[in-house]
Curated annotation (Swiss-Prot):
This is DNA ligase. HAMAP family: DNA_ligase. It comes from the Archaea. Keywords: ATP-binding, Cell cycle, Cell division, DNA damage, DNA recombination, DNA repair, DNA replication, Ligase, Magnesium, Metal-binding, Nucleotide-binding. CDD domains: Adenylation_DNA_ligase_Arch_LigB. The keyword Phosphoprotein does not apply. The gene is lig.
Length: 573
């Protein structure tokens, strides 16, 4: 399949803002591949359309930043001055390269047109290049691609290299296209994607005529992590009890979500971003290997513990453990970790359609019961132990007074609050569900993505000191909700400035526009209505709590979350 044929449809998708039209254009693309291409072409275009050449669970990226791309573009014959001027004018490196493509040194007029397969495989290879001369090799490969490309191809190659296609397409739109073209129930397609995290594989299977509901490659598998199920906000414990009937309450731990996979004695541990963190936590791996059970996927919260106080250490200590590559054993001696497991997603077979109460029963056979109302003395003793693996502390009750006591106790041992779960509910990967709620004592912190950065003043003049922050809507469009600079230490500012310089895509002088890759957790005095921002809301006195290196743009809060918090707080006043 020629890459230019793909780019023509990408151009149509980019030019419309209507989601239904984008869906129709992708259906047109599927039909073109069905007639003129191969099954693997749908795998390739499904990934490329959302700015990827790897499946999400593979934990790989092309790994090229804007600066290296600029260097590669310069070697094609485009001057740095013209390139920077055009980027400033258009705000888009892809459009800039396309507009300046007449300056690119062309190879023979008889050179073959680029194929989709060639572009896809070439960009996958970029991630594998390492060593002292890796930058030169990557620059040469990118340059060669651009020299062979037509103007519109150069636009999309440049954007794909940065993994930001800027065409307004996302996973739900592609899934809707699959559903329409192959005449399959949308919920079925969404569910199968949720257990594979591989839009390309799903597309290839569909166009090959697979019975996707019974295809073994499209089932939940050990060592292929899935996105976590997410909780809703609730205005009160009483409201959540009404929604969940006889709920299961659990402590909401001050830690990091992890997924543990075990099969044939092998253990892998994944973060909420599906990163493989196994090598960073060897003591946990050894403990899990001792469990007399196999072929299982567990979910829990990893907590850094201060064993002298029985309370969790700061969240940054967990990240220090997860990011550590050297002297891991020494770090393990300084920062003790434990996991509180709260779910079993797979045991010999997928369990996500099984009610929570039955999944919990399996969990308790492995790690004990930890019922707060009947085993409190045992729980409080074990909090100070060297034990590493626990089942989460829980309470089954519909009594709001007892639930509030459990909530206050969870806060007293240093954790964030409680979770309220429907015991009859299945597990829905990657979705924010109405069968699980979270209760915290203060305003819910927000996870936001940085979209711009501005040079600081005074003591901060050597760093980017102020950051524009945004949330997303259901179509993954970003909406500015404020600017933040307070709460950041000098170490934070130095770290952020380094990252900003790697991911800036447009320089406006004292301010730069960024790829949306930095996630911050922020607190604030309140959410208020505002005409300043298009979304209609703004954070009053936002303050950075921490840099969330464990989260990506996929994990940030939504416009709906902001509206819900605003309504909850307004009703409390």
């Amino acid at each position: 399949m020629l890459f230019i044929d793909f780019c023509k449809i990408l151009d149509k998708i980019e030019k419309t803002t209507k989601r239904l039209e984008k869906t129709d254009y992708f259906v047109e693309l599927i039909d073109f591949i069905k007639t003129n291409g191969k099954p693997e072409n749908l795998k390739q275009v499904s990934q490329i359309t959302i700015g990827r050449v790897f499946a999400e669970f593979e934990n790989k990226e092309i790994g090229i930043g804007p600066n290296l791309l600029l260097e590669a573009v310069k070697t094609t014959g485009i001057s740095e001055k013209d390139l920077k001027s055009k980027i400033k004018e258009t705000g888009d490196i892809g459009i800039a390269v396309e507009n300046l493509s007449s300056n690119i040194k062309q190879v023979s007029l008889f050179s073959q047109a680029l194929t989709l397969e060639e572009v896809y495989s070439t960009l996958k290879k970029l991630s594998e290049i390492e060593g002292n001369s890796s930058q030169k090799k990557k620059t040469r490969i990118i340059s060669n691609l651009l020299i062979l490309a037509t103007p519109v191809e150069s636009r999309y190659i440049s954007r794909l290299i940065l993994e930001d296609m800027r065409i307004g397409m996302n996973i739900p739109t592609i899934l809707a296209s699959f559903s329409n073209y192959f005449n399959i129930n949308k919920e079925t397609v969404e569910k199968i994607y949720a257990v594979t995290n591989d839009i390309g594989l799903l597309g290839e299977k569909l166009i090959s005529g697979s019975n996707i509901e019974n295809d073994s490659e499209l089932q939940l598998k050990v060592f292929r992590p899935i996105k976590p199920m997410l909780a809703q906000l609730t205005p009160s414990i009483e409201a959540a009890i009404i929604e969940t009937k006889m709920p299961q309450f659990e402590t909401k731990y001050d830690g990091a979500r992890v997924q543990v996979h075990k099969s044939d004695g092998n253990v892998k541990i994944y973060s909420r971003r599906l990163e493989n963190i196994t090598n960073s936590v060897p003591e946990l791996v050894e403990e899990i290997k001792k469990i007399d059970i196999d072929n299982i996927i567990l979910e829990g919260e990893c907590v850094a513990m201060d064993l002298s106080s029985g309370k969790p250490r700061p969240f940054q200590d967990i990240l220090r453990r997860f990011r550590r590559k050297y002297d891991i054993d020494k770090m393990a001696e300084k920062i003790a970790l434990r996991i509180y497991f709260f779910d079993v997603l797979y045991y010999e077979k997928g369990l996500i359609d099984t009610p929570l109460k039955d999944r919990r029963e399996i969990l308790e056979k492995l790690f004990g019961t930890n019922n707060w109302d009947t085993e409190l003395s045992k729980i409080e003793k074990e909090i100070f132990s060297n034990k590493m693996l626990f089942s989460s502390f829980k309470l089954n009750s519909d009594d709001p007074i007892l639930a509030k006591e459990f909530f206050n106790w969870s806060l007293s041992i240093g954790h964030e609050g409680i979770m309220i779960k429907n015991p009859d509910a299945p597990y829905t990967p990657g979705s924010r569900v109405k069968t699980m709620y979270k209760v915290k004592p203060t305003l819910e912190n927000l996870d936001v993505v940085v979209t711009r950065a501005k040079i600081g003043m005074g003591k901060r003049k050597d760093w980017y000191g102020s950051y524009e922050i945004s949330v997303k809507d259901y179509e993954d469009n970003l909406h500015v909700i404020g600017n933040v600079g307070t709460g950041l230490t000098e170490d934070d500012l130095e770290k952020l400035t380094k990252i900003v310089n790697e991911i800036k895509i447009e320089d406006l002088g004292e301010e730069v526009i960024l790829e949306p890759k930095i996630v911050l957790e922020v607190t604030y005095e309140e959410i208020q209505t505002s005409e300043k921002y298009e979304m209609g809301y703004a954070l009053r006195f936002p303050r950075v709590v921490q840099i969330r290196e464990d989260k990506s743009i996929n994990d940030i809060n939504t416009l709906d979350d902001v509206k819900k918090i605003y309504e909850i707080e307004r009703n409390r006043k």
